[in-house]
């Protein structure tokens, strides 16, 4: 996973975003156990408290859940995962369209760039 962090956003927020992307893309499957806080902190090169905050955000959002001493797991609610995926896709499309508008691209120019 890419752990290069930008300076324009808190690291815990970027961790939350990357872990969400890993869940919706299937890197972490529904029901799969996530690496421990310490393992993620070492892998990402950040403080364990930062990872804990990111995982707490994911729990609050319902994408992961804790099982006392067993660790954290990805939700098995595939509708929740699908909704998170659509939310991310919608944000990215919005960013793309804003960039194209800033460049002065017309609707037809934008459509010609999209190859599905």
What does each of the following model-derived ranges do?
Residues 78-103:
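Conserved segment of winged-helix/HTH DNA-binding domains
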């Amino acid at each position: 996973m890419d752990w290069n962090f930008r300076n324009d956003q808190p690291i815990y927020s970027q961790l939350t975003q990357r872990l969400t992307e890993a869940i919706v893309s299937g890197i972490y499957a529904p029901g799969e156990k996530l690496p421990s806080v310490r393992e993620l902190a070492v892998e990402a090169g950040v403080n364990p408290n930062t990872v804990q905050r990111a995982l707490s955000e994911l729990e609050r959002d319902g994408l992961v859940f804790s099982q006392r001493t067993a660790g954290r797991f990805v939700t098995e609610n595939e509708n929740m995962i699908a909704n998170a995926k659509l939310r991310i896709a919608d944000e990215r499309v919005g960013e793309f369209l804003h960039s194209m508008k800033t460049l002065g691209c017309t609707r037809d120019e934008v459509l010609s760039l999209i190859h599905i």
